[in-house]
Structures are given as C-alpha cells and as structure tokens.
Amino acid sequence: MVRVKRGNVARKRRKKILQLAKGYRGAHSRLFRVANQQVMKALRYSYVGRKQKKRVFRKLWISRINASSREKGVTYSTLINSFKKSKINLNRKMLAQIAVLDCSTFYKLIDDAKSPN
C-alpha cells in the first residue's frame, strides 16, 4: 500500500486559514480547527453584508430624497411618480446626492416634474 504524503498541501491549506484568521482573539487565531470555524463564519457574514449594504444604501437614499422633497411639500412616492411621467431618468443615488449637495437644483427638478408637459 502506498503511503499518502501531503505535508505541503495540508500545511499550505492550514496556513491559508490561519492567515485569514489573523487578528482574531485567543485560540481563534492560533488553533486551526477553531480558526477554520471562525473564518467560515466571517466569510458567511461578509457575503451577507455585501447583500445588505445594497438595501441599506437604497433606504438611506430614499429617506434623504423624502426629507428634501417634503420641505417642498411633495411626498416621495408622488415625486418618483411625477419623475417617471415627465421622463426624468435620475436614479435614487443621484437624486439623493443632488438633494443633499445642491438643494436649489433639486427643487428645480421637483418643479419641472410637477409642471404638466
């Protein structure tokens, strides 16, 4: 029977996991088995976090647009509807940036959207 020799492969695999676990406290950065569990958990959290980030930013943009548009007396939903009807194709990220950084332009956009074409 042939002897299985995988010292290099196993060492590289363990070293890679321990490298990813650098900065964790206690055994989580030193012991392979515990570190492996923590790295798997961390990678799972980072994957989920990347998906949640998109939701969180969209919520933020919507709340900023809503706050700025209510100063002008228009709700968010009616504003977006009027933008769609008047074919103003600005996404929520751009609208939020305009609302925060340049209020006068944002108010002009609202007036343009309100006025019947």
Curated annotation (Swiss-Prot):
Gene3D superfamilies: 6.10.160.10, Ribosomal protein L20. One of its GO terms (cellular component) is chloroplast. One of its GO terms (molecular function) is rRNA binding. It is found in: Plastid, Chloroplast. PROSITE patterns: RIBOSOMAL_L20. Keywords: Chloroplast, Plastid, Ribonucleoprotein, Ribosomal protein, RNA-binding, rRNA-binding. It holds the Pfam family Ribosomal_L20. InterPro entries: Ribosomal_bL20, RIBOSOMAL_L20_CS, Ribosomal_protein_bL20_C. GO terms for biological process: ribosomal large subunit assembly; translation. Its main location: plastid. HAMAP family: Ribosomal_bL20. Binds directly to 23S ribosomal RNA and is necessary for the in vitro assembly process of the 50S ribosomal subunit. It is not involved in the protein synthesizing functions of that subunit. Belongs to the bacterial ribosomal protein bL20 family. This is Large ribosomal subunit protein bL20c. The gene is rpl20.
